[in-house]
């Protein structure tokens, strides 16, 4: 995908380069779940934490014509790419992208929050496929010493910004389910279900704010 600077994801083709993760088919589960839990004509506000190329947020906005979305990413290069993709898909009138880390983002209240944060622990990064570790941005993969450092920040921020009964969809590592569920419950989230990926690993937790 990096060689041709494009990648098909959901129903669109997105511009990508070495500054963003290549969208994975497993991540399309996030979009399916948002569609499943929302109405087509609903006017909802959605936040994408760690937006990267913008592919998740923009795919949802293509399916939900009355949604408005915001995406944040700590990488300026990523935000430039997400803005480019929004313009290319004619969705820039319903999206805003911000260069920001999770802790310092204070804008808005949201009906839906989605996030695919870095969740790979430091030591495991060395064991990844060579194509991944050599070409994809470490910033988007590195979840800190135990793999939870960014997940904790995302859960804390979502708890502050999500509306009551709001939908939170979080992608996780295959061995992180139990600890993340505990974190979510401690922050006042009700666990609706855990989704598996195509390899039958736990991959997404769907919850709502009580």
Q: Which sequence ranges carry the predicted segments?
A:
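Conserved AdoMet
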Residues: 1-37
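Conserved beta-strand segments of alpha/beta enzyme cores
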Residues: 13, 68, 94-96, 190-193
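Conserved SAM/SAH cofactor-binding pocket of Class I
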Residues: 29-127
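Class I S-adenosylmethionine-dependent transferase superfamily signal
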Residues: 34, 60, 132, 154-158
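Conserved RecA-like P-loop NTPase ATPase core
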Residues: 86, 116, 132, 154, ...
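Helix-to-beta-strand junctions that scaffold the AdoMet/dcAdoMet cofactor pocket
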Residues: 91, 136, 162-164
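Mobile active-site "lid"/loop adjacent to the S-adenosyl-L-methionine
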Residues: 119-150
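Conserved Class I SAM-dependent methyltransferase catalytic core
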Residues: 145-208
């Amino acid at each position: 995908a990096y060689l041709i600077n494009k990648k098909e994801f959901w129903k669109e083709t997105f511009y990508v380069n070495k500054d963003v993760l290549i969208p994975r088919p497993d991540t399309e589960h996030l979009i399916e779940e948002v569609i499943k839990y929302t109405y087509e004509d609903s006017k909802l506000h959605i936040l994408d934490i760690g937006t990267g190329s913008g592919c998740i947020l923009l795919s949802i906005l293509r399916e939900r014509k009355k949604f408005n979305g915001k995406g944040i990413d700590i990488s300026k290069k990523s935000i430039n790419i997400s803005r480019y993709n929004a313009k290319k898909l004619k969705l820039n009138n319903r999206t805003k992208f911000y260069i920001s880390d999770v802790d310092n983002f204070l804008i808005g209240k949201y009906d839906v929050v989605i996030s695919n944060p870095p969740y790979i622990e430091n030591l495991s990064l060395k064991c990844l496929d060579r194509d991944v570790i050599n070409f994809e941005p470490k910033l988007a993969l590195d979840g800190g010493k135990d793999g939870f450092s960014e997940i904790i920040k995302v859960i804390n921020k979502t708890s502050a910004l999500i509306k009551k009964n709001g939908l939170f969809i979080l992608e996780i590592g295959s061995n992180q389910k139990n600890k993340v569920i505990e974190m979510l419950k401690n922050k006042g989230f009700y666990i609706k279900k855990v989704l598996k990926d195509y390899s039958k690993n736990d991959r997404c937790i769907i919850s709502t704010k009580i």
